[in-house]
């Protein structure tokens, strides 16, 4: 499916970026193929009017622990002991995986489309990656 995003405020992510208007973002099969003037003929594209909303590339988070929500801990805890306790039972593993999936969704809803995990529970991060890719 081809989409044309119109009437948006574009932030392109460059160092000295300025809001750009009067442009249209063309997407073919999930890939941005061009950014053209909004006067361009959009035949063959499903038009999505952004109604003046902002649009920008996905953010990248290069240091993620999906087993945590990113909030500061109120008290010190023994993470190694906690991980062993969580991984011991299929029920607690299932609960932990659901939490990890939720934290990944929080990243996505915050505009982060790419993450690099640097430690987590078992193989939860690769399992989640594979489920998303399927």
Segments (PLM) and residue ranges:
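Conserved acidic residues
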Residues: 2, 45, 113
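Short, acidic, Ser/Thr-enriched surface-loop or helix-capping motifs
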Residues: 5, 27, 49-50, 61
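A generic local structural motif
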Residues: 12, 47, 101-103
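Generic detector of well-ordered alpha-helical packing
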Residues: 13, 35, 50, 62-64
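Short, well-ordered secondary-structure micro-motifs within conserved domains or adaptor modules
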Residues: 43-49
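Metal-associated gating/positioning segment near the N- to mid-region
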Residues: 54-131
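A metal-dependent hydrolase metal-coordination microenvironment
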Residues: 134
